[in-house]
Amino acid sequence: MLVKGNEILLKAHKEGYGVGAFNFVNFEMLNAIFEAGNEENSPLFIQTSEGAIKYMGIDMAVGMVKTMCERYPHIPVALHLDHGTTFESCEKAVKAGFTSVMIDASHHAFEENLELTSKVVKMAHNAGVSVEAELGRLMGIEDNISVDEKDAVLVNPKEAEQFVKESQVDYLAPAIGTSHGAFKFKGEPKLDFERLQEVKRLTNIPLVLHGASAIPDNVRKSYLDAGGDLKGSKGVPFEFLQESVKGGINKVNTDTDLRIAFIAEVRKVANEDKSQFDLRKFFSPAQLALKNVVKERMKLLGSANKI
């Protein structure tokens, strides 16, 4: 059943576990995510970006999610707009049936971010929709979001406290050292867990970890074995994800891992049978690989068996 984002995350916040927020761009990805939720008895945070909405069409995206909710009525599901860049984009998502939206004004100055977030919160709350915002800036590239290393800034905990109090946002994504994409760290992975814990203490709301793909060894191997190139890639270690949840993270965004796992299987089929053109032969193993990544993440973060 489709529910407000806060309905899922407040429970995670109170009970101290994390919920994976999984991006989709087509039916195959969505189907695999729902199958994983069903098999692991986990609530689902389904999200899609402005770029993916442009690709699928917003009515199609919402329609597919609603259809899957009818197939699995026992699973609490939030449909979330990831990285909404404007008020209009968030409003469009709310009107289309999303139950959670993110307004990402983190590239603006604090006061501008606060003003725009507050405007979105008022609009969304009037419609019964939850809102996420971001403070600090994550390095990396995701859809139309691109931030250089010199522009990446970690969150200020006191500013986070003020921001949450004044905006009344439902959950916050604090920048603590992760980055978008497959190339998250130049040296050894490092996240500012002390900063995270202070933000949690001062805000006392669900927190979100962006740039949280791990690029697990088995997924990396499958991609490389199929002829892919991930030179220099480095994800967030599993133990860091677990430590983040202990420090107050309740929503863990995951996109890159899903893409890599899916495409690895498509490449594999293409390499092994160059005469193959039955799409089902490509997408069936790709869905299974993606589902396994999602199931593993649900168990790691603690959302398995939380329905």
UniProtKB/Swiss-Prot annotation:
Binding site for D-glyceraldehyde 3-phosphate: S49
Annotated Zn(2+) 1 binding sites: H83, H180, H210
Pathway: Carbohydrate degradation; glycolysis; D-glyceraldehyde 3-phosphate and glycerone phosphate from D-glucose: step 4/4
Active-site residues, Swiss-Prot/TrEMBL: D82
Enzyme Commission number(s): 4.1.2.13
Molecular function via GO: fructose-bisphosphate aldolase activity; zinc ion binding
Residues that bind dihydroxyacetone phosphate: G181, G211, A212, S213, N253, T254, D255, T256
Cofactor(s) listed in the protein's UniProt record: Zn(2+)
Catalytic activity: beta-D-fructose 1,6-bisphosphate = D-glyceraldehyde 3-phosphate + dihydroxyacetone phosphate
Stretches of the chain forming a coiled coil according to its record: none
Alphabetically ordered keywords of this record: Glycolysis, Lyase, Metal-binding, Zinc
Biological process according to GO: fructose 1,6-bisphosphate metabolic process; glycolytic process
EC supergroup of this enzyme: lyase
Residues at which Zn(2+) 2 binds: D104, E134
Iron-sulfur recorded as keyword: no
Pfam families membership: F_bP_aldolase
Cofactor info, note text: Binds 2 Zn(2+) ions per subunit. One is catalytic and the other provides a structural contribution.
UniProt keyword annotation of Nucleus present: no
Entry similarity comment: Belongs to the class II fructose-bisphosphate aldolase family.
PANTHER family: D-TAGATOSE-1,6-BISPHOSPHATE ALDOLASE, D-TAGATOSE-1,6-BISPHOSPHATE ALDOLASE SUBUNIT GATY-RELATED
Quaternary structure, from the entry: Homodimer.
Task performed by this protein: Catalyzes the aldol condensation of dihydroxyacetone phosphate (DHAP or glycerone-phosphate) with glyceraldehyde 3-phosphate (G3P) to form fructose 1,6-bisphosphate (FBP) in gluconeogenesis and the reverse reaction in glycolysis.
Name used for this protein in its record: Fructose-bisphosphate aldolase
Gene that this polypeptide is encoded by: fba
